[in-house]
Regions:
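N-terminal maturation segment of proteins
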Residues: 1-601
Length: 601
């Protein structure tokens, strides 16, 4: 038997990692169109988490072994940038493109392990991505076409009850060990549970698939009747009681012992500070400490405050940041009045961006983007917007989910920047392009560091101004407010989780430096409490992308082409920031007069 080549080993390993990831996270598998796990959920038990970690650790060991063999024992993060000369003493048997894949795989597996080691699953109560909201959104993307799909759906719905009970058991075990969630976001989850439990079962989102059942071909009357009865029983007899048990336990057991608003951060949980350090690496893809990120945030806030003062002087008649923010928050004319207005503004912004992108990007996605209003079960306690990737098989477009609740609290001047971040040229453009790169292994089409995804979204907000997409100076004030918002995240996330800030101090900092509405600020701070480190990705990624663009423009001069630069940034999938720098450096070198190298991905 022939000895496997490094390339064949890498191909096998990349496929094995993708399979392990889909099996570990079945809801993600469904969201990207893989239907094999539509009947199950992730295993949140201690044994399930340990099993997932063991799978990822075995893959990490294999990737490290391959790296040592293929790169002549040169650690991958010390190897030359793609397209550059080989290191002395290390004769790589993987070409530059394959080395990027190996680097990405090691980065991704390491992040998976760090996420599990942080231990959040055991004690965290997440009103944004946890029970029950995560489950209530599943009908939006789980397919129901055939009777077999119906069997899978019923099985998964029943698994939701078991998952909820296991989640409660974990919360109780953690409470006994002295690890407990922060009160403020836990209150939000309790309110969401109370709201859904107060809703008649027939109106639950989990029964929405029944509305279109009669129109589905290939079902006999008996199959329709059995499925409808089984789905109803799963929701009414399994999930509803499980949600009620969780709600009651939160009220009587967890909330009375929850950490107060004075101690919201991971640093107040045993082992939390170490876990937070790991999450910084996960979300930024860089070896930065909390203090350094905190300082970067403060520096960015100072710069943006100055820019905002100058623009406010021209637009609002005051250069005082405090007065400008008060004017932005206090003028009802600057806010929407109806839900439809909020939606229509997003739609018109998306349409303008769609028309403009061919001048700025050579590669465009085939998948379209649509705007979807958040459902009532999530909008009150959710963020202002989020994005869901398209189904790779074309059955679902990319979706920009918009929170249209309480329109009088939603500023008009922020709506355009929000749309460009979530849709085009932001998340939709980047994620849809990544999914449509046929030369990449599956995991690179769908996974990647938060710093790349969110860094691109924030980069896109500023790019939209260069593209001429903003209507006026008030909308540009919205851009600066959003930029300050992301810079403030560096300050408040590290402030709470590493430096011990109370929740009120984080809220006050956001209020002093952004034009965000008070309700939005409170929602955001509670989001950072339950998703530690995630908020660090935005500014970290944006700043690196801006640096790369500036360096490339200086190096290439008149030879710099913005379309080629953007195609280079997005043409290799979502990469760790050091790997992205290597890709851009190779592209610049290839275009430098006299260079014989070629770019790679």
């Amino acid at each position: 038997m022939d000895t496997p080549t490094p390339q064949s080993r890498l191909d096998t390993l990349a496929a094995a990692y993708w399979e392990a990831y889909l099996e570990t996270y079945p809801l993600f598998a469904t969201s990207v169109g893989d239907r094999r796990y539509d009947d199950r959920l992730a295993d949140p038990s201690d044994a399930g988490v340990a099993g997932a970690r063991a799978r990822f650790a075995a893959l990490q060991d294999e990737a490290d072994s391959l790296g040592a063999d293929a790169l002549g024992a040169v650690p991958l993060d010390e190897a030359d940038a793609p397209g550059g000369p080989d290191r002395p003493g290390g004769a790589p048997e993987l070409d530059a493109a394959a080395r990027v894949t190996l680097d990405a795989l090691r980065e991704s597996v390491s992040a998976d392990i760090a996420q599990l080691d942080a231990g959040l699953l055991a004690w965290n109560i997440d009103p944004i991505e946890g029970v029950p909201v995560d489950f209530l959104n599943v009908p939006d993307y789980q397919r129901l076409q055939s009777p077999a799909d119906g069997h899978h759906m019923v099985a998964r719905w029943c698994a939701m009850a078991a998952y909820t009970d296991e989640h409660l058991a974990s919360l109780r075990r953690s409470l006994a060990d002295g690890r407990v969630a922060c009160r403020a976001p836990a209150d939000r989850t309790t309110a969401i549970l109370a709201e859904i439990l107060g809703t008649p079962t027939e109106d639950w989102p989990l029964l929405a698939p029944l509305a279109g059942l009669d129109a589905l071909p290939g079902w006999s009357p008996v199959e329709r009747e059995r499925f409808a009865a089984a789905l109803w029983a799963a929701v009414n007899d399994e999930i509803r009681p499980a949600f009620a048990r969780l709600h009651d336990a939160l009220v009587t057991e967890i909330l009375p012992a929850a950490r107060p608003a004075e101690r919201p951060g991971m640093c107040h949980v045993e082992g939390g500070l170490e876990g937070y350090r790991g999450l910084i690496r996960v979300h930024t893809s860089l070896d930065l400490d909390a203090g350094e990120l905190h300082r970067i945030g403060l520096d960015e806030i100072a710069r943006i405050d100055s820019e905002l003062g100058e623009l406010a002087g021209r637009t609002l008649g005051t250069r005082s940041l405090e007065d400008a923010l008060a004017a932005l928050r206090g003028d009802p004319a600057l806010y929407f009045t109806t839900r439809d207005e909020t939606y229509e503004k997003a739609a018109s912004s998306l349409a303008r961006a769609t028309d403009a992108i061919p001048a700025w990007f050579g590669r465009l996605p085939e998948a379209p983007c649509e705007i979807v209003r958040m459902g009532p079960h999530e909008e009150v306690h959710s963020t202002i917007a989020y994005y869901r990737q398209p189904a790779p098989d074309g059955s679902r477009p990319g979706q920009y989910y918009l929170n249209t609740s309480s329109p009088r609290t939603k500023p008009r001047y922020e709506a355009e920047a929000l749309a460009y971040h979530e849709s085009i040229p932001g998340h939709h453009l980047q994620i849809a392009i990544g999914q449509e790169l046929p030369h990449l292994p599956e995991f690179r089409r769908h996974l990647g560091p938060t710093a790349f995804f969110e860094g691109w979204g924030l980069y896109a907000e500023r790019l939209a101004d260069e593209m001429g997409l903003y209507t006026g100076d008030l909308d540009r004030i919205g851009v600066l407010s959003f930029d300050a918002w992301r810079a403030a995240r560096l300050v408040v996330d590290t402030g709470m989780h590493a430096l011990g800030w109370p929740r009120d101090r984080a809220i006050a900092f956001m209020h002093a430096h952004t034009a965000l509405a008070p309700d939005n600020i409170a929602n955001e701070i509670d989001r950072y409490i339950v998703l530690p480190g995630q908020a660090l990705a935005y500014k970290t990624g944006q700043l690196e992308m801006l640096r790369l663009r500036t360096e490339a423009r200086v190096a290439l001069g008149a030879g710099f082409d913005i379309r080629d630069f953007h195609d280079t940034l997005l043409g290799s999938g979502a990469l760790a920031l050091p790997a992205l720098r290597g890709i851009v450096s190779a592209w610049v070198e290839h275009r430098t007069p006299g260079s014989a190298s070629t770019p790679s991905s």
